[in-house]
Amino acid sequence: SKITGPIEASKRRTVQASVAGIETIKAFSLEPTQRKEWRQISSSSIRRSVAGQIANLAVTNINSTLTQIMTVVLVFTGVLLVLAGSLSAGAIISCNMLAGKLVAPVTAIFTFFADLTNFKNTIDTVGTTWNGPTERLGAGNQHVVKGGVVCRDVIVKFDDTAALNGLNLDIAPRTKVAVVGPSGSGKTTFLRLCQGFLRPNMGAMEIDGQNIRYLSLDNYRSQTTLIDAKPVFFGATIEENLRKVQPNISEREFQEILDISGLSRVLEELPDGISTEINQFGLPLSQGNRVTVALARGLMAKPKILLLDEALVNFDKSTQIGFFENFPKIAEHKTVMMATHDMRLTAEFEQIVVLEKGIVVGQGKHEDLLKTCPLYKELWTMDQKLSGA
């Protein structure tokens, strides 16, 4: 109805955004925000529903009154016609019965459509309820992350396949690390492990000396951000997407993040600027601009660990140059790990980790790995040939 229609549409949008962007919600620990938004919309829906029921009751009463008036008018007119000799008593009784038979089906038709709408809403509600194991969010230690990551014999399996197969790694806090290796070597799995979305099947992963199993997930994720080449957003304006992560950020910090992420330049090219509406996939923005928005959103969270999974693959050359010009500011006070196939980018990092079949086969600086790690040298040589260097 006109009373409940808009609010029900808002409920559906909220549910759809929560389902489609569930990993984004988990990544930024936005569960309380989404829960609050849902409760506010549900409260409005209840109030609107009560108003709708009152309106429906009024319509029902009016319909009943009109039906009774119609019966009285029909009988009164019939009596006059009978007295005038134009109609028999049997005819008036027949007309009254026929009118009753006509009114009932018409009323039933309207009732059917009302019931059909209620049934559809119920099915929608049931259909959008997802069942799955709940995560251990608030339980665990509240820890201020510094950014140290240690993996000891970590194994992560998908079915019977080991994506990480005895990973041993030690990354100091506030280090800039490039993670390289052939496809299927475990780069993305490692980053998602660092994000807190995966758990080791065997072995131990420590954050600043604490086993990640004993940390509060929502507390840890709120200090860790992963950005990949296909980010997911909420159907809203660019500004609303950014502020959802950090509603109380100051205007100075907000503008600074727009500048260092490169989003300021992107916004200048958009007719509606920061008020541009985007859908969950970031359309109508180009793929590179979507990643820029995702980078700005990630920096809004002020993460202590920043994870980039092939995030620069859709950047053009000028955007890549701008990114690395601002990289010192982006990486300030953070541990940064970037998985990449573009070996030319590794020179910007303090350490390089080389993965193959889920294990570390090399770790160090570019010059050292060229001498000590055959796989790294092979990857570097192939990249140089492709680039014509």
Question: Which residues are covered by each model-predicted region?
Answer:
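Catalytic Walker B motif of ABC-type/P-loop ATPase nucleotide-binding domains
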Residues: L306-E310
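Helix-to-loop junction immediately C-terminal to a conserved catalytic motif
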Residues: Q195
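C-terminal portion of ABC ATPase nucleotide-binding domains
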Residues: E325, H333, D342, A347-A389
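A hydrophobic transmembrane-helix motif
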Residues: R47-N96
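Conserved signature/switch motifs of ABC ATPase nucleotide-binding domains
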Residues: A301, E332
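ABC ATPase nucleotide-binding domain helical subdomain, centered on the C-loop/LSGGQ "ABC signature"
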Residues: E206, R221, E239-Q280, F324-E325, ...
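Loop segments that connect adjacent transmembrane helices in multi-pass transporters
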Residues: T4-A51
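Cytosolic ends of transmembrane helices, especially the final helix of ABC transmembrane type-1 domains
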Residues: I7, K11, L30, I54, ...
